[in-house]
Swiss-Prot record:
Key words, A-Z: Cytoplasm, Metal-binding, Nucleus, Repeat, RNA-binding, Zinc, Zinc-finger
Keyword Cytoplasm in record: yes
Domain KH: 59-120, 155-216
Ranges of compositional bias, category Low complexity: 426-446
UniProt cross-references to PROSITE patterns, sorted A to Z: KH_TYPE_1 (PS50084), ZF_RING_2 (PS50089)
Originating organism: Xenopus laevis
Record protein name field: RNA-binding protein MEX3B
Length: 507
């Protein structure tokens, strides 16, 4: 239509006013073209009558919530909840910033804005109910009364108390652990605040609540290595020490004990004074006597089985054994049951019958011991003082190597056998009373010492009363031993080993 009109106007244009008429016609043509492109012709006028009504559907509404805490709950962590609500309702929701009024501004179509408004108000009411339940339970705890039952039928609320130091462990990083427990058990768990008691409130169905409590306790056990007892009498568990030995008690218990009577190491251990030699075994044997504070010896805890378990926690090879295994000892625990024969205690060493007197210093270290090899006695390398001797004389620990040292080339087996036989005969012929037996043993020992005294291997005049360190050869008098040590390069005349000092042997 516009092109034909333009052709007609060109054909009809004439005269002086034709130029103006042509310009007017061209302007009219351009206007008609623009109107046709915009669709404002009469045929389509009815379709655009509703255009103002379509634009009026987009609207903006303000939705107010009670507090800024409600805003934080509705927005969610890093805006995750509000983003989901925007996508669900196809609206734009402007969240209030901190310090402003808690009002959400929702923009969109009318029905979408109404849906977003209902969602926001529902979330705010739900959070208000949760806050009211928390305040009610807190008031019940402070008032000492029983918490009110939950609103929903069939649900129950329990309290799970944990130690203060594991509250953060149960909550987890950014609440991940407690959320996982809630999702797995289908419960709602209220975590304790910093200024309240360490009690988790678990709400849900009874079986789900029990599962949640078990999950919390299991998580604490896994992360700390063992179950934590919060009883007042168990202060070791309360302050965070000795946790986790219950699971591995079989590794530390005595080998001869049955599994039914076995106890954890946390109940059978030395305190901070164990380095000073306190080793109480009352908790292990179930006795009520006072603790025996004599020093524990690794050699006294020798076990004759192959797993090398002992009560003191020391582990030694099977080659370390007492000298004479055919002797019996009386128990060191009067009111309690007798311990296994493989676990000797230090007190039994002091109470063994017929043994020579021992000289102890303040630290309980055996100083002067004389051990003689006899019938039925087997010698083995030792890491600690011997358990007992052959009812005879004791020898210094550094000087007794001459008895079993083949490098020295000097053997006194005849003298040793004579000493053991004489000592055994004197003890067997003594009376049944302990006093007469000990006096007979001491007299025979003193007589044997005078009879078997030796002369110095250098001067052949004085009695042998000195030994060289570290080789331990006791073949010299004190004067000759000192002269050996005073040389420029002191060495033992027997084994030619370096000598650091000479010690006097007291019998």
């Amino acid at each position: 239509m516009p092109s034909s009109l333009f052709a007609d106007m060109e054909r009809n244009g004439s005269g002086g006013g034709g130029g103006e008429t042509l310009d007017d016609q061209r302007a009219l043509q351009i206007a008609l073209d623009q109107l046709s492109l915009l669709g404002l012709d009469n045929d389509e006028s009815a379709m655009y009558d509703n255009e103002p009504r379509k634009k009026s559907i987009n609207m903006t509404e303000c939705v107010q919530v009670p507090s800024s805490e409600h805003v934080a709950e509705i927005v969610g962590r890093q805006g995750c909840k509000i983003k989901a609500l925007r996508a669900k309702t196809n609206t734009y929701i402007k969240t209030p910033v901190r310090g402003e009024e808690p009002v959400f501004v929702v923009t969109g179509r009318k029905e979408d804005v109404a849906l977003a408004r209902r969602e926001i108000i529902s979330a705010a009411e739900h959070f208000s109910m949760i806050r009211a339940s928390r305040n009610k339970n807190a008031a019940a705890l402070n008032g000492g009364s029983v918490p009110a039952p939950p609103n929903l039928p069939g649900q129950t609320t329990i309290q799970v108390r944990v130690p203060y130091r594991v509250v953060g462990l149960v909550v987890g990083p950014k609440g991940a652990t407690i959320k996982r427990i809630q999702q797995q058990t289908h419960t709602y768990i209220v975590t304790p605040s910093r200024d309240k008691e360490p009690v988790f409130e678990v709400t849900g169905m009874p079986e789900n609540v029990d599962r949640a409590r078990e999950e919390i306790e299991a998580h604490i056990a896994v992360r700390t290595g063992g179950l934590i007892e919060v009883a007042d009498e168990n202060d070791f568990h309360a302050n965070g020490t000795d946790v986790g030995f219950d699971l591995h008690g079989s590794l530390w218990s005595k080998s001869n004990q049955s599994s039914g009577s076995r106890k954890a190491l946390s109940n059978y251990r030395n305190d901070s004074s164990s380095s000073l030699g306190s080793a109480s075994t009352d908790s292990y044997f179930g006795g009520t006597r006072m603790a025996d504070y004599s020093p524990p010896s690794p050699d006294l805890s020798y076990t004759n089985n192959n797993n090398n378990n002992n009560g003191n926690g020391y582990v030694y090879s099977t080659g370390i054994s007492p000298d004479c295994t055919d002797l019996t000892f009386e128990s060191g625990f009067d009111p309690a049951p007798a311990p296994p024969p493989s676990a000797y205690t230090w007190s039994q060493l002091e109470r063994s019958t017929g043994s020579a007197p021992y000289h102890n210093n303040a630290n309980g270290i055996l100083l002067n011991q004389r051990r003689l090899n006899g019938v039925g006695c087997t010698t083995a390398p030792r890491l600690s003082p011997p358990l007992h001797t052959c009812n005879g004389l004791s020898e210094h620990p550094l000087a007794r190597r001459v008895r079993s040292d083949p490098g020295g080339g000097l053997s006194y087996s005849a003298y040793s056998n004579m000493a053991c036989d004489s000592s055994s005969s004197s003890s067997s012929s003594s009376s049944s009373s302990s006093s007469s037996s000990s006096s007979s043993s001491s007299s025979s020992s003193s007589g044997m010492r005078r009879k078997g005294s030796r002369e110095c291997s250098i001067c052949f005049e004085s009695e042998v009363i000195a030994a060289l360190v570290p080789c331990g050869h006791n073949l010299f008098c004190m004067e000759c031993a000192n002269r050996i040590c005073e040389k420029n390069q002191p060495q033992c005349p027997v084994c030619h080993a370096g000598v650091t000092q000479a010690i006097r042997i007291f019998s």
